[in-house]
């Protein structure tokens, strides 16, 4: 296989480079022996751990790459020592000038091979995760997955793959622990030990998802054995995707009214109350975070839909009439169309009872933003709604809100906008 050949070639170059470095150290003055011995002490165990033959199982690649990265870092440090001004003259008298050029050339090759190897490891991991998903493997190394996700380039597809893998194979405790670790590393956020302990001990009680989770704003855990009555006040969770710009904290107590939520024709009153308690705080970002997908902001109302918040959380916008509501719904539907919720039109029809985004028969009065509150099955987070299907209902909606009397509330869409996600 291509990746196996690349790894083998990479290790050949790495071995050659290591030997050249060691040979150079041996020719240095006695005063440099201390540095040489220190380098040798660090490198030798790592080289011994490197398998002679690349393991067949992809599971070991992550540990393997950890060793490779450590070796490369040590070799870079060793190279800088060799060509430093302090020992340059010794090297000059001990060997030809061409040696440094050869060494630099070898280092360049090594760097290129390392880049190829890392790129291949990303593809290997993705292929491995997909295979696990398709074969229904019962166990997956979440630690390895976390390393892959937080140390490789992020894309929408890789985030979705990581998300599905977490849903499918992790216990709630593992899911949230490794998700937080990946997020903190990505955003360069300092971990709060006390908060981490609270989250890890509380989240295992989470059996159902908040509307924000259903809309794709965060990772989540499902525990079908948990009793909603056991949740009560003690479940307080903080949820953030690597792409998010806001960290959302909320209480779940009022969201556990399963029967009311599942049978309501619009948003349940308890959900609206829960949004009143939302605390939204900016997430600290670094340069790495700026390379991720654009962040999504939570837009919510607590005044019967009279206002909503846009990307600038300090900017309050009025929803006085049809035009503004069309703008809000248009953004919402565009997002739903691109957010990997429903696999296709037929799938949507089959799953309509458990995923009621909207009521197709009464679109203007019942724009349902209910989450899935089903403890029996996990949500389908694959594909997207068919554009034609969404467009048909959007067109009907736009036509229905051309009022003869603009202030007549009966012709307006439901004012119960609780949570919108705007691009």
Swiss-Prot record:
Primary location: virion
Swiss-Prot/TrEMBL keywords: Late protein, Virion
Taxonomy, superkingdom: Viruses
Cellular localization per UniProt: Virion
Inducers of expression: Expressed in the late phase of the viral replicative cycle.
Cellular component annotations (GO), alphabetically ordered: virion component
Family (UniProt): Belongs to the asfivirus E423R family.
Protein name: Uncharacterized protein E423R
Organism (species): African swine fever virus (isolate Tick/South Africa/Pretoriuskop Pr4/1996)
């Amino acid at each position: 296989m291509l990746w196996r050949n690349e790894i083998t070639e990479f290790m050949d170059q790495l071995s050659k480079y290591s030997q050249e470095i060691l040979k150079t150290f041996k020719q240095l003055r006695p005063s440099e022996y201390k540095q040489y011995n220190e380098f040798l002490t660090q490198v030798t165990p790592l080289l011994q751990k490197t398998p002679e033959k690349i393991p067949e199982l992809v599971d070991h690649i992550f540990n393997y790459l950890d060793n490779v990265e450590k070796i490369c870092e040590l070799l870079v440090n060793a190279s800088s020592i060799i060509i430093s001004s302090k020992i340059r003259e010794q090297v000059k008298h001990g060997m030809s000038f061409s040696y440094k050029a050869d060494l630099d050339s070898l280092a360049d090759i090594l760097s290129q091979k390392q880049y190829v190897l890392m790129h291949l490891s990303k593809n290997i991991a993705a292929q491995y995760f997909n295979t696990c998903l398709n074969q229904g493997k019962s166990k997956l190394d979440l630690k390895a997955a976390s390393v892959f996700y937080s140390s490789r380039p992020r894309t929408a597809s890789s985030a979705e793959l990581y998300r599905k893998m977490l849903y499918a194979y992790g216990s709630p405790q593992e899911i949230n622990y490794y998700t937080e670790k990946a997020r903190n590393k990505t955003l360069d956020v300092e971990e709060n030990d006390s908060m981490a302990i609270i989250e890890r001990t509380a989240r295992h009680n989470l059996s159902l998802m908040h509307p924000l989770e259903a809309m794709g704003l965060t990772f989540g855990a499902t525990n079908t054995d948990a009793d909603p009555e056991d949740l009560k006040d003690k479940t307080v969770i903080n949820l953030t995707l690597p792409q998010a710009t806001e960290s959302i904290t909320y209480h779940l107590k009022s969201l556990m009214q399963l029967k009311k939520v599942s049978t309501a024709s619009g948003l349940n009153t308890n959900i609206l109350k829960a949004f009143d308690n939302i605390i939204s705080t900016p997430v600290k970002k670094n340069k790495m975070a700026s390379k991720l997908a654009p962040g999504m902001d939570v837009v919510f109302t607590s005044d019967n839909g009279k206002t909503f918040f846009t990307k600038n959380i300090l900017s309050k916008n009025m929803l006085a009439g049809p035009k503004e509501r069309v703008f809000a719904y248009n953004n919402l539907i565009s997002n739903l169309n691109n957010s990997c919720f429903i696999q296709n039109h037929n799938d949507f029809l089959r799953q309509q009872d458990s995923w009621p985004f909207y009521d197709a028969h009464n679109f203007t009065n019942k724009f349902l933003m209910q989450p899935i509150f089903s403890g029996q099955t996990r949500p389908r987070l694959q594909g997207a709604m068919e554009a034609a299907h969404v467009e048909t209902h959007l067109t009907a909606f736009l036509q229905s809100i051309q009022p003869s009397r603009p202030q007549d509330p009966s012709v307006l869409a439901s004012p119960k906008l609780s949570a919108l996600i705007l691009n």
